[in-house]
Amino acid sequence: MMLHIPGVLTKAQVAQCRELLDAAEWIDGNATSGTQSAQAKRNRQLPEGAPAARAVGDAIQDALARHPLFFSAALPLKVFPPLFNRYEGGETFGTHVDNAIRLLRGTDFRVRSDLSATLFLEEPDAYDGGELCVEDTYGTHRAKLPAGDLVLYPASSLHHVTPVTRGERVASFFWIQSMVRDDGDRTLLFQLDTQIQALSAEKGAKDPMVISLTGIYHNLLRKWADA
């Protein structure tokens, strides 16, 4: 499942984040690449330990913790600290799949990458190209979202970023270890939760059907979750 999550950051928050990021020093994006990715990656990246990366990353994680749609879809157990990249002048990232395990350098913090996320930090009309293209059994899905919006997709997916031929594409990217490892199970829970929320808004939280379906949701979560 590929999901557009709008409004993770407000426009004002995006502007504050960009002020910090634009003043920072960027390096070759292959500093964090695996063997496969290094063959395809042509972009720049903010060093993981840079003060701007930590400050903006903390702001993003705070925003994610308050976003009900993100929680419902991802059921996050651990979130890898957000990283940041930028593309311009034909830079691109060819087709690849993300590493299954991400290790935070200098620590014992590890994340199984169940989900990948890209948070856009530049408006789509400010650059040409730069689409995130995610492949699955149903074809190729493209994302080029407003600044502050996020796209969430299975980390097992082949994906690439098309060349940026005008302007500059700036984004944050990170990985989530979900409480529910299996993408199919997680998708079913998300669909069920979405319907429960809609039914609750229509009939009220005390409606017997809402209570029954909520119980089913939590029993399935109890069965499938690793917490």
Swiss-Prot record:
<feature type="binding site">
    <location>
        <position position="169"/>
    </location>
    <ligand>
        <name>2-oxoglutarate</name>
    </ligand>
</feature>
<dbReference type="Pfam" id="PF18331">
    <property type="entry name" value="PKHD_C"/>
</dbReference>
<dbReference type="GO" id="GO:0031418">
    <property type="term" value="F:L-ascorbic acid binding"/>
</dbReference>
<feature type="binding site">
    <location>
        <position position="98"/>
    </location>
    <ligand>
        <name>Fe cation</name>
    </ligand>
</feature>
<dbReference type="InterPro" id="IPR041097">
    <property type="entry name" value="PKHD_C"/>
</dbReference>
<dbReference type="GO" id="GO:0006974">
    <property type="term" value="P:DNA damage response"/>
</dbReference>
<dbReference type="GO" id="GO:0006879">
    <property type="term" value="P:intracellular iron ion homeostasis"/>
</dbReference>
<dbReference type="InterPro" id="IPR006620">
    <property type="entry name" value="Pro_4_hyd_alph"/>
</dbReference>
<feature type="binding site">
    <location>
        <position position="96"/>
    </location>
    <ligand>
        <name>Fe cation</name>
    </ligand>
</feature>
<keyword id="KW-0408">Iron</keyword>
<dbReference type="InterPro" id="IPR005123">
    <property type="entry name" value="Oxoglu/Fe-dep_dioxygenase_dom"/>
</dbReference>
<keyword id="KW-0560">Oxidoreductase</keyword>
<feature type="domain" description="Fe2OG dioxygenase">
    <location>
        <begin position="78"/>
        <end position="178"/>
    </location>
</feature>
<dbReference type="InterPro" id="IPR044862">
    <property type="entry name" value="Pro_4_hyd_alph_FE2OG_OXY"/>
</dbReference>
<dbReference type="GO" id="GO:0005506">
    <property type="term" value="F:iron ion binding"/>
</dbReference>
<keyword id="KW-0223">Dioxygenase</keyword>
<keyword id="KW-0847">Vitamin C</keyword>
<protein>
    <recommendedName>
        <fullName>PKHD-type hydroxylase Bcep18194_B0892</fullName>
        <ecNumber>1.14.11.-</ecNumber>
    </recommendedName>
</protein>
<keyword id="KW-0479">Metal-binding</keyword>
<dbReference type="InterPro" id="IPR023550">
    <property type="entry name" value="PKHD_hydroxylase"/>
</dbReference>
<feature type="binding site">
    <location>
        <position position="159"/>
    </location>
    <ligand>
        <name>Fe cation</name>
    </ligand>
</feature>
<dbReference type="GO" id="GO:0016706">
    <property type="term" value="F:2-oxoglutarate-dependent dioxygenase activity"/>
</dbReference>
<dbReference type="Pfam" id="PF13640">
    <property type="entry name" value="2OG-FeII_Oxy_3"/>
</dbReference>
